C-alpha cells in the first residue's frame, strides 16, 4: 500500500492523534513507474492538505497573510495553517507551483529578510539577542542517510525523512514571531525563497532562509541575515519548506 493512501486510512479509522504526528511531505504530484502505483496516480500528498480557500481581505492582504509595505506574506510556513505541521521535503520549484496554485508566489529573499527583521532591523524575529527555546532552532542534529533520501518518493526516502523530522506545528512557540506578526521565520523548517539578486550559476535562482530545527550550518544561531546558497532549486532535502507572498492590494500601504 502506498504511504499516502495509508495515511488517509489512518485518519479515517480514528487515528487522528497518530496521523497528526506524521510529517507532511511533498504537496506536489509525483509521476512514478506503473508498477509502483496503487490504483491512484503515484503521488505523495500531505494527507489532510486543505484545498485553496478564498480568504477575506484585511488591510490589503488575505486575512491569513501579514501586510508589509507593498506585499503580503503568509503568517505561517506552508500550508499556512496554525497548528499544522509545515510542508517539507520539497524543492524550490515545488514551492513555486504550490504558491501559484493559490494565486500567490514564492517570497523573494529581500521580502523574507524584511519580514524577519521587522521595521527596526532586528537580528532575530523577536529581538537582537538570541534566546534559547524561543524558536525551534536547537534540536539535536541526526546523522542523515542521504542514499535513502535519494530514493524519494519511494518508501525508503519517506521512512528516512520521517526519522529525521523534528519540526513543530506552526505557531507552537508563541514568542517565535516577528514584530509584525509573522511566525516561525527562524528555525522549524528552512524556507526556500527566490533570489533578489540573480546568481551567475544556472539553476541557482533560489536560496534557503531561516535555517531549521537543528540550527544553521557554520553559524551559531539562525538569524534573519543568514543565507544558505549552496543548493540549486531542484535540491530536495528533509528540512526544507517555504511560505508564500503576494502583491498587496493597490492603494493600501504601510511603512516599508
Regions found by a protein language model. Give the residues of each.
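Generic structural signal for well-ordered beta-strand positions
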Residues: 190-191
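Sec-dependent bacterial lipoprotein signal peptides
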Residues: 1-11
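Short aromatic-cysteine micro-motif
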Residues: 60-122, 129-131, 138-141, 147-180
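Short, acidic, Ser/Thr-enriched surface-loop or helix-capping motifs
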Residues: 184
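Acidic glycine-/aspartate-rich tracts in secreted/extracellular proteins
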Residues: 77-79, 119-120, 194-198, 249-251
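Disulfide-stabilized, aromatic/cysteine-rich ligand-recognition loop
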Residues: 14-30, 34, 38-48, 55-56, ...
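N-terminal carbohydrate-binding accessory modules
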Residues: 50-64
Amino acid at each position: 500500500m502506498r504511504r499516502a493512501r495509508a495515511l488517509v486510512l489512518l485518519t479515517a479509522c480514528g487515528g487522528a492523534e497518530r496521523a497528526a504526528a506524521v510529517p507532511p511531505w511533498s504537496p506536489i504530484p509525483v509521476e512514478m513507474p506503473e508498477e509502483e502505483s496503487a490504483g491512484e496516480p503515484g503521488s505523495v500528498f500531505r494527507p489532510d492538505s486543505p484545498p485553496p480557500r478564498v480568504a477575506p481581505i484585511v488591510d490589503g492582504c488575505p486575512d491569513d497573510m501579514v501586510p508589509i509595505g507593498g506585499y503580503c506574506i503568509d503568517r505561517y510556513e506552508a500550508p499556512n495553517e496554525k497548528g499544522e505541521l509545515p510542508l517539507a521535503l520539497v524543492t524550490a520549484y515545488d514551492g513555486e507551483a504550490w504558491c501559484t496554485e493559490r494565486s500567490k508566489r514564492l517570497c523573494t529573499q529581500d521580502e523574507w529578510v524584511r519580514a524577519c527583521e521587522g521595521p527596526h532591523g532586528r537580528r532575530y524575529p523577536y529581538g537582537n539577542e538570541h534566546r534559547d527555546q524561543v524558536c525551534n532552532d536547537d534540536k539535536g542534529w541526526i546523522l542523515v542517510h542521504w542514499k535513502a533520501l535519494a530514493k524519494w518518493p519511494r518508501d525508503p526516502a519517506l521512512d528516512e525523512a520521517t526519522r529525521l523530522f523534528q519540526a513543530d506545528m506552526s505557531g507552537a512557540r508563541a514568542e517565535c514571531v516577528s514584530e509584525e506578526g509573522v511566525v516561525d521565520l527562524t528555525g522549524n523548517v528552512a524556507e526556500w525563497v527566490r533570489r533578489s539578486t540573480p546568481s551567475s550559476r544556472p539553476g541557482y535562482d533560489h536560496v534557503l532562509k531561516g535555517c531549521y530545527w537543528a540550527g544553521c550550518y557554520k553559524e551559531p544561531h539562525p538569524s534573519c541575515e543568514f543565507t544558505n546558497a549552496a543548493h540549486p532549486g531542484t535540491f530536495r532535502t528533509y528540512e526544507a519548506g517555504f511560505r508564500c507572498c503576494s502583491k498587496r492590494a493597490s492603494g493600501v500601504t504601510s511603512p516599508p
